[in-house]
Design a protein with these regions (language model features):
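N-terminal chloroplast transit peptides
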Residues: 1-40
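N-terminal signal-anchor transmembrane alpha helix
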Residues: 74-77, 82, 104-138
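Cytosolic, membrane-interface loops and tails of multi-pass inner-membrane proteins
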Residues: 134-162, 280-281
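Membrane-interface loop-to-helix entry segments
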Residues: 163-178, 222-234
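Membrane-interfacial loop-to-transmembrane alpha-helix junctions, especially the N-terminal start
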Residues: 195-203
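Hydrophobic alpha-helical membrane segments
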Residues: 206-211, 227-241
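Membrane-interface helix caps and helix-loop-helix hairpins in membrane proteins
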Residues: 216-225, 246-251
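Terminal transmembrane helical module of multi-pass membrane proteins
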Residues: 243-281
Length: 281
């Protein structure tokens, strides 16, 4: 029984890890899967079957205030959903304990599975939350978009120090995400259940949601300047999370430092891309 339960838990971990890896490789290689597009920088136009493909940076019709309001509200909803996953893991822990499933690293496998889903599959939780809201709410929160440009990211001017594409999934999935898992597990282990733990975890979940929002804004909506605002908020919330984790346990805060380092690179890259392409954003 214990072996079977452990295998089921491992299978769930592997499935979520595979989803996260697929998403990361998909984001990095999004432009590479398409044939080269016309150069829109000099006024060229192209059409799809029904609608024109707009030039770089034009895949979102909302005003800045409208887009940021929608992104912020969606991030808070997603963060609440992530907290719900953690609560479900906590509620499931006594069930596994009653079945004789041993703890792993001092934590119930149910709680560890919840950590894994939250950290590696936050965007999947966000999609689930979106699907569970009413059509009217989705209409209010979804940005107004138009078809974007194929090969958009490839065509952007980038700094000479732009990291190679293969480094991104390695840093996110091999370095950043596992150390985040260790940090959250550490915080969970050294704090009592209640508001003191809860608000720190919520701040961390908001940081994850803002990271997913940046992916949508930059890659999905093809908005460099607006993406810069979102990634700055994402970066700030990450630094805040590391600080409040460290208040409770210094090691928990330090375990978020690899992510802080990598997001520093990502934020600087977004700033550089904006500086090089702002006349066309």
């Amino acid at each position: 029984m214990k072996v079977t339960s452990s295998l089921c838990i491992f299978a769930a971990f592997a499935a979520n890890y595979a989803e996260a890896a697929t998403q990361a490789f998909g984001l990095i290689g999004e432009a590479k899967k398409h044939k080269p597009a016309p150069d829109f920088r000099h006024g060229a136009t192209a059409t799809t079957t029904n609608m024109p493909i707009v030039a770089r940076g034009g895949a979102c019709d909302d005003t800045n205030a409208a887009l940021f309001g929608k992104v912020g509200a969606s991030a808070l909803l997603q963060a609440a959903g992530l907290m719900g996953v953690l609560a479900l893991g906590k509620l499931s822990a006594p069930i596994l304990s009653g079945l004789g499933v041993p703890d792993l690293f001092g934590t119930s496998p149910a709680v560890l599975a919840a950590f894994f889903v939250v950290i590696f599959g936050s965007s999947l939780v966000g999609t689930f939350v979106d699907g569970g809201t009413s059509a009217a709410l989705n209409q209010a929160l979804d940005p107004n978009t138009t078809p974007g440009e194929r090969g958009w990211y490839e065509s952007l001017k980038k700094p000479s120090w732009n990291p190679p594409g293969w480094l991104f999934p390695i840093m996110w999935l091999v370095v950043s995400k596992p150390t985040q898992l260790a940090a959250v597990n550490r915080l969970w282990s050294v704090t009592e259940d209640g508001a003191d733990r809860g608000w720190r975890l919520f701040a961390y979940c908001v940081h994850l949601s803002l990271g997913d929002a940046w992916n949508k804004t930059f890659f999905g909506y093809q908005c460099i300047g607006r993406g810069l605002v979102v990634i700055t908020a994402f970066y700030s919330m990450l630094l805040f999370s590391a600080y409040v984790f460290g208040q409770v346990d210094p090691l928990a805060g330090k375990l978020l430092l690899p992510t802080c380092g990598w997001v520093t690179v990502a934020t600087a890259l977004n700033w550089s891309i904006y500086s090089l392409n702002k006349s066309e954003d």
